[in-house]
Design a protein with these regions (language model features):
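Bacterial N-terminal signal peptides
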Residues: 15-27
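Boundary at the C-terminal end of the N-terminal hydrophobic targeting segment
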Residues: 29-34
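Mature N-terminal segment immediately following signal peptide/propeptide cleavage
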Residues: 57-73
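Gly/Gly-Pro-rich "capping" loops immediately C-terminal to redox-active cysteine motifs
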Residues: 64, 76-114, 135, 181, ...
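Protein kinase-like catalytic domain
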Residues: 75, 97, 149-152, 193, ...
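Axial heme c-ligation environment in periplasmic c-type cytochrome domains
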Residues: 84, 103-112, 116-145, 243-267
Length: 316
């Protein structure tokens, strides 16, 4: 015979069942509290940072909106280079958590200056998806520099490196171009960049960056009158690359390998590889099957004035 709904046995059965369910629930909850947290972590509050560019002070707290609107799509909310657009981009967006930057005025392995990051935002990066952000005000750029610095603890523990000293550019001569060509061979630049600087050297297909992503050497021969190198368009910008290297890539620093003036000779030679570009170097050297014509005194060109050098200086 079925038990009555209000019988003592029915009440005891329901009470025991409820007690078991509650006990199991408490056990699961306790176990979850004791278990290690292996799920995704929510973004942690960012430490306030500042940047200093001339007489402008940037504040990270003032860049949150701009970063999320203009930068997070590629660089990610956490600054790790894993924004929703990143999977479609080549090269991948910069991972700010590593605090490793390509365009710097400081020696390899050191943090860039605030001015370096400021200039990179304004200038963009050639042959990448990093655009020119010259529509931002200087204050917005300074604030973004401060915000970028919140993503890595390196900025709390280390100071930015000292900017390298760039000696005055010597006159462009056939001698300097010839010496630069010899250095290009001796330093084995051709292994990556190719004998004609087209980025097609024998090692080009094997190169990877610091995240093991394929990376292409720069094609110097593609230059036009409006061309820019990765970190700028002036001869001073190219000079810096030889001394600072390009961190996060196979491009090393030659600061301990060559004399400062040797770097200028390399710059002058590289300009001649841009055969479609009108330059003082190509006014001297009209490439003819890669043969350098004899040097004459009339081919010497005076270096830029001090004012021009100063105007071309600054960050990366």
């Amino acid at each position: 015979m079925p038990m009555a709904m209000n019988s003592p046995k029915r009440v005891q059965f329901l009470t025991a069942s409820l007690s078991f369910v509650l006990a199991a629930g408490f056990a699961v909850a306790a176990s979850a509290q004791d278990a290690p947290d292996v799920g995704p972590h929510p973004p942690q509050p960012l430490k306030a940072m500042e940047s200093h560019i001339g007489n402008i002070t940037g504040h990270s707290k003032d860049a949150k909106s701009d970063y999320r609107r203009y930068c997070a799509g590629c660089h990610g909310d956490l600054g790790d280079g894993n924004g929703e657009n990143a999977v479609w981009l080549d090269p991948r967006p910069r991972d700010f958590t590593m605090a490793t930057f390509k365009c710097r005025s400081t020696l390899t392995g050191t943090l860039p200056t605030d001015e370096d990051l400021f200039n990179t935002i304004a200038r963009g990066l050639t042959n990448s998806n990093m655009p020119i952000w010259n529509t931002f005000t200087k204050q917005q750029r300074a604030d973004l520099v401060a915000y970028i610095k919140t993503f890595s603890p390196r900025w709390e523990k280390e100071k930015a490196g000292e900017p390298i000293k760039i000696p005055a550019e010597p006159a462009v001569t056939m001698e300097s171009i010839s010496h630069g060509k010899a250095l290009f061979t001796k330093l084995e630049c051709w292994k990556c960049h190719g004998p004609q600087g087209k980025g097609d050297g024998p090692s080009a297909a094997t190169l990877t960056d610091s995240k093991d992503q394929p990376i292409r050497p720069y094609n110097f021969a593609s230059g036009k009158d409006d061309s820019r190198f990765k970190c700028g368009s002036t001869n001073q910008d190219v000079y810096k690359i030889f001394i600072t290297g390009v961190d996060g890539t196979p491009m090393p620093s030659f600061a301990d390998v060559i004399h400062p003036n040797d770097a200028w000779d390399l710059v002058h030679f590289l300009r001649t590889l841009q055969v479609d570009r009108h330059s003082k170097e190509n006014d001297i050297l009209k490439a003819a099957h890669g043969v350098i014509p004899p040097y004459t005194e009339k081919q010497a060109i005076a270096p830029a004035s001090h004012g021009e050098n100063r105007a071309a200086g600054g960050g990366s």
